[in-house]
Amino acid sequence: MRFGGQRRCIESSDDNDSIDSMSIQQKNKEKEEWKWAQSLARRLEQVLNVHPEKYQNGCSSQRPSRQPSPVEQLAPIRSHSADFGRAAEMASGNSEEGKGMLLRNGDDRIRLPSPQRGTPDTSSTQGHPYTDQIVTINVSGMRFQTFESTLSRYPNSLLGDRNKRQHFFVSDTNEFFFDRHRTTSSSFTFEIRNYLFESILYIYQSGGRVKRPEIVPIDIFLKEMRFFQMGDDLLEEFWIAEGYEKPKEVMMPNNKTQRKIWELMEYPDSSLSARIIAFISIAVIALSIISFCWETVPSDIEEKPINNSATAELLDEMDEKHYSPFFWIELMCILWFTIELILRFISCPCKVTFATSVLNIIDFVAIAPFFVNFFFADTSKSNSSMSFAVLRVLRLVRVFRVFKLSRHSVGLQILGKTFRSSVQEFCLLIFFMAIALVLFASGMYFAEQGEPNSKFTSIPASFWFVLVTMTTVGYGDLVPLSPFGKVVGGMCAMIGVLTLALPVPIIVANFKHFYRQENRLASMKSKGDDADDDIA
């Protein structure tokens, strides 16, 4: 019995040993399969360039941290389309892997050859963009990197011209350093960004798209564009992007004397003498308008019927007016206007442009009636039947002198630009008013046709009532009497309000646009001159 039990114990122990050996073999097999799977996965990651930072130093057991190094935090490297930077874990030895640079775009990284220390390479920049030379730009401590071919898109700029940017090269750090304004912003991710230079660099990357960040003032952005010598075309693109057109280049006379006279008469802000002349011109215009209005105040003048005898008496009174103070005031004003117009015409750089200018035509029309009235008075006496109407028209033309103030008033010039840009809206308003005028005048005539005391005797006679009602003036000289006439009048008033309200916001928007543009032009001109002085 003892031997039998001992035999069974030995057999059971042998079975346990065989089971343990089988489990060990199975575990070893699983480990080998797992190692094979891991090696295959690592091989696939290397081929597919997934997490390349794990294989920089030939070690796959440790995965580098995603947190940037203190150097990266102090000097972040920025670019608009891709973020270039050196990895914190990149080896500093002589191995081939340690000599590379990482091109970071999101979470994927691609190893590129790092630029050599010392003088930058001046070899050709043609070829694939990922094999192009990388240029490092340091703007007040913030580093940017881009390809040299990107900067060469604008070869005349400061960054695009190698000779120009060579003056800012620092050989110790192998970068171009610019001590410029640094408009930065830190978001909730504690990411510091230089929006000002990013927008400058974006001009190179986008091929000429100028976009000013909202946090960057206009004068600072313009100063930076002038510093980096972006060119007139990009400056014009910037002006258009800001909502206004670049002012046209002013033609100036080549002759020195003509240039001085032209500046005195045409540009009041050019000198103190020009301001004095402009002030005298405004005073003479005001005096002429006051004299023109005060001359019509009745004193001992009696209304006379318009006939040949009245015309003859009017012509005789012209001789008596030579002794009137209004005549001498008019003569003095006309002499000033004439001298001013002649000096402008003599010194202008282009005679054709001067003759076709609206303001110059107004100046000529303002002085022409006086000379026609003065030199042809004797001739008018022989043909008195037509001279009376001509003289009245010439007197009426004198009122156009008020438009001479537009030469010295920016507000009147803005109003004129608004009217010119709103011609389509005015035509649309007149078209709607004409349709409503015919419809409601016809309705009012037929609605009031049965009333005995109605003043709406015809459709043209109803035009006045419809026009006054649609413009919400309502003189009250014409009033509908029938109930249907009152209904038509009420509908006419409501339609008139809607018709007038539709184009008015567009006209107001045009006025605001030109007003804001004029203010910006003045601000940009002053700040641009300051920027030129700073750059010089």
UniProtKB/Swiss-Prot annotation:
Keywords: Ion channel, Ion transport, Membrane, Potassium, Potassium channel, Potassium transport, Transmembrane, Transmembrane helix, Transport, Voltage-gated channel. It is a multi-pass membrane protein. Disruption phenotype: Delayed spike repolarization. Residues 1-275, 344-356, 447-458, 508-536 are cytoplasmic. It is found in: Membrane. Residues 116-131 have a biased composition (Polar residues). The chain crosses the membrane at residues 276-296, 323-343, 357-377, 426-446, 459-479, 487-507. This is Potassium voltage-gated channel protein shk-1.
